[in-house]
Structure formats: structure tokens, C-alpha cells
Amino acid sequence: MTVAHILIVEDSPDNMKLFRTLLTLKGHSVTGIPGGEELFSTLAGGRPELVLMDIQMPGKDGFELLAEIRASEYADLRVIALTAHAMSGDREKAIAAGFDGYITKPIDIRLFPEQVLSALAGEAPQGG
């Protein structure tokens, strides 16, 4: 099993707790922040192998934050969209914007750890 440092950018405390629990139970090191204000200072403190980012957040949304990441020294980070947007075309929009994968919320707690492993392996996870 691949054990990794994962950064979660998620404004919902309940979702953050769930994601953190599922990933730490699999042995991953997890850092969680509630939004973009802390993103670059957190990245400077330790580069994660993977970023899981909510798309709809107060302040800057996930698309804006991703654009900032892609224009920075962290441009090569793997960033996976975490979103409740599950309508036709939403996944394509996220991938076109530069996300490396797309996981819908609410997540399937049985599949989520495997989706993260796929992302760590360089694959593009999809679905919920």
C-alpha cells in the first residue's frame, strides 16, 4: 500500500473529519485546511503527494485555487476535485480546468480510499 502525505482543502468540518478519518485509517498523513487562505503557506511547510480540493468554497473556489497552483512552483502537484457537482458536464469542466481527477460527494466510503490510491498512482479517479 502507498502511504502518502495528503492535503485536503475542504470548508465543511464534517466532510473534513470523514476524509481525514478514512485516510488516516489507511496510514496516510493528512493535513486539512478550510480554504485557500492557508493554501500556499501550507504547501511551503511540506509538499504533499496529493491535494484533494473542494470546488465550492467561500472566498476563492476550487477552480480559482487550482489556477493559482498551476501558475506557481507547485504546478505539477496532483490535484483531485472533491465536489457535489455531479451533473452532466461537471467532470469534463473540472478536467478541462486542470484537475487530475474528480470525486463526487457524498463519497462512497468503501470506494474513497481506493480512489485516493488510484490518484496517488497517477490515474484519474472518477465518480463518488
Regions of interest found by a model, annotated:
Residues 46-52:
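Active-site beta3 strand of CheY-like receiver
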Residues 10:
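Conserved acidic carboxylate
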Residues 54, 83:
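Active-site residues of response regulator receiver
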Residues 107-116:
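C-terminal output helix
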Residues 33-37:
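Conserved Asp/Asn-Gly motif in the active-site loop of CheY-like receiver
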Residues 57:
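Receiver (REC) domain active-site loop signature in two-component systems and cognate sites
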Residues 13-31:
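Two-component/phosphorelay signaling modules centered on CheY-like receiver
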